[in-house]
C-alpha cells in the first residue's frame, strides 16, 4: 500500500479517540528507563506535546529515583529501601529536592522547545500535595510522605492558562516540613483529584500478563474484577503489585482508564491512546463502555 495512504489511514484511525478525549485531562506518570535515554525522553515529551496540540489537557508527574540514588552515592551515602520506598533522612531529602527540581526544569525546557508552554512545580507550590509521615509496617522511614489531600487550585490555573503542569512529587505536612512522595502515589492522587479521564504509568514492562512467565499473555483490557482476581491468586508480584493497586484505586475513585505502558517503546502514549490495538494494559471499571474493537480484548 502507498506509504502516504498508510499515514492517512493512521490519522483516520486516531480521529474517534481525538474526538472522545478532546478537552479531557490526562495524567502521565513519567519514570523508569525512559527518563535515562535522551532519545526515549524526547519521544515521550513529543507524545505529551501532541496530546496537548490535539485538544487534550496533559499533566506530567515525574519521578527521578535512579538519579537520586546516583547523587546519594556520590555524597558517600547508601540508598536504602523498605518495601520499595526510599528511606529518606535529612541528607537524602535535600538530595531528592535538588535532583527532582533539576529534572523538573529539564522537562519544562524540553516541552517549551517544542512550542508548548509548561510550568514546573513541586507539590510544595500552592500546597498542592499535602501529606503526613508514612509508616511502613509501623517503621519510621524518615521524610517519606503519604498524601492526605491534593489542592488542585494551582494545577487548574495552569491548565486554564494553556500551560502543561509538570509536577515533582514533594509534599508538605501540616508543619510545612517537606516530604518525599512516591511518584506513582502522587500521580494516582493527582489524577483522582483533578477528575482525569486517563492516567498512564510509563514503566519498564509492557503491561499486565495473565501469566507473568509467558510474554504472549499480555492483557489489553483488564477489569477491576479480573485485576483483583490476579492479585488474590498470586499472579502479580514485585514492583507490579503496588502499581496495579494504585491503578485499581484510581479507577475506583473515578478515573475512567488507567494504562500501564512500556516507556521504552517509541511513542508509547500515541500508540496506546490513538490506535485500535494499543500496546499496553488498560485497567477499566467492570461496567465501562468499551470501544467497538475491544469486545474481544477484555479480561474480566
UniProtKB/Swiss-Prot annotation:
EC number: 2.7.2.8
Biological processes annotated in GO: arginine biosynthetic process via ornithine; L-arginine biosynthetic process
Repeat keyword on record: no
GO cellular component, one term: cytoplasm
Pathway info: Amino-acid biosynthesis; L-arginine biosynthesis; N(2)-acetyl-L-ornithine from L-glutamate: step 2/4
Keywords tagged on the record: Amino-acid biosynthesis, Arginine biosynthesis, ATP-binding, Cytoplasm, Kinase, Nucleotide-binding, Transferase
GO molecular function: acetylglutamate kinase activity; ATP binding
Residues reported in the UniProt entry to bind substrate: 64-65, 86, 180
Marked site (Transition state stabilizer) residue numbers: 29, 243
InterPro entries documented for this protein: AceGlu_kinase-like_sf, AcgluKinase_fam, ArgB, Asp/Glu/Uridylate_kinase, Glu/AcGlu_kinase, NAGK-C
Keyword hit for Iron-sulfur: no
Places the protein is found: Cytoplasm
Gene3D superfamilies xref list: Acetylglutamate kinase-like
Annotated catalysed reactions: N-acetyl-L-glutamate + ATP = N-acetyl-L-glutamyl 5-phosphate + ADP
Domain of life, source organism: Bacteria
Principal subcellular localisation of the protein: cytoplasm
Family: Belongs to the acetylglutamate kinase family. ArgB subfamily.
Known function: Catalyzes the ATP-dependent phosphorylation of N-acetyl-L-glutamate.
Protein known as: Acetylglutamate kinase
Organism: Lachnoclostridium phytofermentans (strain ATCC 700394 / DSM 18823 / ISDg) (Clostridium phytofermentans)
